[in-house]
């Protein structure tokens, strides 16, 4: 696992893992996996956590060691690639493969599909990404602008 994660990541994961290893036995409860993963910035759904546990043969009332925790974190982070997800969604909407989508069409999709956004949330997103309400939205520019990491103050 060390070849996939930096030493800093491993140290951060170990620190969080230790907080949930209440009996200092090198194990955490499976029921603590979701919250510990979210504390580390991952965004698993309860279903994804259940699948991770099943993959490793761990019952929902069982425990997992740090090595298994590292593997699960690596797999979760690897599958959470927002740029790739956004690009795939935009490509599905672009039937003619033009490389862009009209802002009005993007607004409609954001308000009707998946985790539906409100009109104001779409307005805020467009403002943040510098999109004109009636303009064209180029995939690469849009993805780059909305996936910029939040500055740490």
Curated annotation (Swiss-Prot):
An annotated Gene Ontology molecular function: calcium ion binding
GO biological process: brush border assembly
Keyword vocabulary terms for this entry: Cell projection, Repeat
EF-hand domain boundaries: 8-43, 44-79, 81-116, 117-152
The organism's place on the tree of life at top rank: Eukaryota
InterPro entries according to UniProt: CALM/Myosin/TropC-like, EF-hand-dom_pair, EF_hand_dom
Tissue: Expressed in the small intestine, in both mature enterocytes on the villus surface and immature cells that reside in the crypt stem-cell niche.
A GO cellular component entry from the record: microvillus
Function: As part of the intermicrovillar adhesion complex/IMAC plays a role in epithelial brush border differentiation, controlling microvilli organization and length. Acts as a light chain for MYO7B and is required for efficient targeting of the IMAC to the tips of border brush microvilli.
Subunit record text: Interacts with MYO7B; the interaction mediates the association of CALML4 with the IMAC/intermicrovillar adhesion complex. Interacts with MYO7A.
Family classification: Belongs to the calmodulin family.
Protein name in the entry: Calmodulin-like protein 4
Lineage, opening ranks: Eukaryota, Metazoa, Chordata, Craniata, Vertebrata
């Amino acid at each position: 696992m060390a070849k996939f994660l930096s030493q800093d990541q491993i140290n951060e994961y170990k620190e969080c893992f230790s907080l949930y290893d209440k009996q200092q036995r090198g194990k955490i409860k499976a029921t603590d996996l979701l919250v510990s993963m979210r504390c580390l910035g991952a965004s698993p759904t309860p279903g994804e956590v259940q699948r991770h546990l099943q993959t490793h043969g761990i019952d929902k009332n069982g425990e997992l060691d740090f090595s298994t925790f590292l593997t699960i974190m690596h797999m979760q982070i690897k599958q959470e690639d927002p740029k790739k997800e956004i690009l795939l969604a935009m490509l599905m909407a672009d039937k003619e493969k033009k490389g862009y989508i009209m802002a009005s069409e993007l607004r409609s999709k954001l308000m009707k599909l998946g985790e539906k956004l409100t009109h104001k949330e779409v307005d805020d997103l467009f403002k943040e990404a510098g999109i004109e309400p009636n303009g064209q939205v180029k995939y690469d520019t849009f993805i780059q602008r909305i996936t910029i990491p939040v500055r740490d103050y």
